[in-house]
């Protein structure tokens, strides 16, 4: 066996290097993880790798918490298909029409609701761009500030519960999903308020950045405003808050709440006369595609991680870093910097499923709270989505608003990237921003 020649821990380092190279070259992530895990596992500890692979796949497919994934995905897609977010944006736009910078606030409000409904950044940025860009162009809003608001608002889908990433992260880090949901609420609101405060300050300094909407885009009467409020804003917002509230206060498990949310989204689509057989079929197919992708990735990464752990590499890495005798926050900074850089070219899925399990023993050894660390990772990945040179959010927005110059989109995003860093620093300095609400609700 090759493990008699090469130290198993060294084999683990080679495994990670080959894995990162294969992913950056462009090999499919799931098959790369399975293949490399099988090959290096067999080299390291022989036929036991067959049992390990079967066990990990079986555990993932029977994990109850992950059953919420397809239901939350379907809920978000159904709301998107039914045009509920467009109606919500129109409602907020009418109510704030006489306020300077009103479209920025409308985008941020809708992004919070839509982020909670979908948890998918690409979908959020795309829909927000389609909804808001036309009105912003017509009202002569500043392209850079508009692009920054849309992309930053769209990335809230990573953080604001019921985020799909948090649902997946819970079992990976062995943290209750309910704790992660409660922990993410205040940081999510904090970031949204930072965005809103920044746009308010910019519009106050330079009113031309967000002028008052023209007469043709305002409501003709207060009756129209109230109708839009009750028909366009209340139903989708109530659905999201009911699903989230039932989880936080223990009335339902995440899976049960996701099922109710999915049914509620269908009923709202039916009430708005937007539910057709073709749209339902399309929503189901999209849900199946996204769920299959996530589930296979989770299973493959669990198998890869178990092989990596059995080779003993995480313990060697942990002992080495702890032996440096440096401040634990310096090590945390290194970890956060690594996650930030990986967040440029990669989606959150491989980072959460591959990188986090590798560094988890180190974080536990340093004595950091895992719930707090999970939220740090989420905010960090948000920041990476807004950071050139890759900045995937920029390409999503450019795809639906081709008339906006990519340079302006980048400049707009970087303003909000700075706000993200401010938020991240606040969460590090004040951990209770994350831990207070879970402690209040669950007493932990």
Region spans (language model):
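Long, contiguous bundles of hydrophobic transmembrane helices that form the permeation core
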Residues: 4, 172, 179-290, 395-415, ...
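Membrane-interfacial loop-to-helix junctions in multi-pass transporters
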Residues: 6-12, 25, 61-67, 94-106, ...
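Hydrophobic mid-bilayer segments of alpha-helices in multi-pass membrane transport proteins
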Residues: 9-20, 25-45, 67-74, 189-195, ...
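Transmembrane alpha-helix interface/packing and boundary motifs in multi-pass membrane proteins
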Residues: 20-29, 76-80, 110-122, 150-158, ...
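Core transmembrane alpha-helical segments of multi-pass membrane transporters/permeases
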Residues: 24, 31-34, 60-86, 112, ...
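Membrane-interfacial helix-loop connectors
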Residues: 40, 127-139, 169-182, 311, ...
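Short amphipathic alpha-helical coupling elements at transmembrane boundaries
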Residues: 55-59, 87-98, 127-138, 147, ...
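Hydrophobic transmembrane alpha-helices that form the pore/transport pathway of multi-pass ion
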Residues: 93-168, 348-377
């Amino acid at each position: 066996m090759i493990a008699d020649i090469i130290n198993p821990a060294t084999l683990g380092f080679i495994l990670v290097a080959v894995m990162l190279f294969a992913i950056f070259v462009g090999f499919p992530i799931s098959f790369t993880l399975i293949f490399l895990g099988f090959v290096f596992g067999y080299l390291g500890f022989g036929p036991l790798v067959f049992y390990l692979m079967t066990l990990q796949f079986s555990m993932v497919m029977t994990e109850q918490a992950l059953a919420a994934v397809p239901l939350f995905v379907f809920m978000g897609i159904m709301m998107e298909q039914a045009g509920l977010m467009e109606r919500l944006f129109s409602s907020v736009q009418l109510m704030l029409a006489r306020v300077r910078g009103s479209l920025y606030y409308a985008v941020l409000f809708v992004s919070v609701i839509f982020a909670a409904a979908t948890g998918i950044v690409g979908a959020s940025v795309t829909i927000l761009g389609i909804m808001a860009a036309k009105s912003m162009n017509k009202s002569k809003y500043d392209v850079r500030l508009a692009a920054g608001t849309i992309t930053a608002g769209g990335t809230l889908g990573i953080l604001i519960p019921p985020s799909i990433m948090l649902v997946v992260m819970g079992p990976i880090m062995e943290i209750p999903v309910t704790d992660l949901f409660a922990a993410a609420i205040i940081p999510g609101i904090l970031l949204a308020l930072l965005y809103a405060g920044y746009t308010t300050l910019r519009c106050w300094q330079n009113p031309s950045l967000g002028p008052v909407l023209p007469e043709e885009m305002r409501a003709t009467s207060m009756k129209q405003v109230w109708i839009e409020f009750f028909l366009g804003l209340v139903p989708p917002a109530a659905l999201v808050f009911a699903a989230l509230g039932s989880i936080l206060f223990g009335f339902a498990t995440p899976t049960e709440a996701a099922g109710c949310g999915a049914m509620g989204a269908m009923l709202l689509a039916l009430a708005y006369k937007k539910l057709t057989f073709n749209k339902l079929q399309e929503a189901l197919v999209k849900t199946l595609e996204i769920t299959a992708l996530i589930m296979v990735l989770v299973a493959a990464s669990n198998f890869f991680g178990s092989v990596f752990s059995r080779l003993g590499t995480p313990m060697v890495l942990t002992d080495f870093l702890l032996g440096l005798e440096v401040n634990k926050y310096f090590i945390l900074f290194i970890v956060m910097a690594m996650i930030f850089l990986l967040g440029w070219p990669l989606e959150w899925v491989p980072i959460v499923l591959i990188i986090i399990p590798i560094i988890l023993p180190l974080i536990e050894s340093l004595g950091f709270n895992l719930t707090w660390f999970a939220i740090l990772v989420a905010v960090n990945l948000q920041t990476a989505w807004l950071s050139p040179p890759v900045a995937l959010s920029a390409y999503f927005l450019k795809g639906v608003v081709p008339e906006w110059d990519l340079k302006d989109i980048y400049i707009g995003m970087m303003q909000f990237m700075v706000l993200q860093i401010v938020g991240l620093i606040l969460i590090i300095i004040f951990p209770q921003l994350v831990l207070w609400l879970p402690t209040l609700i669950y007493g932990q």
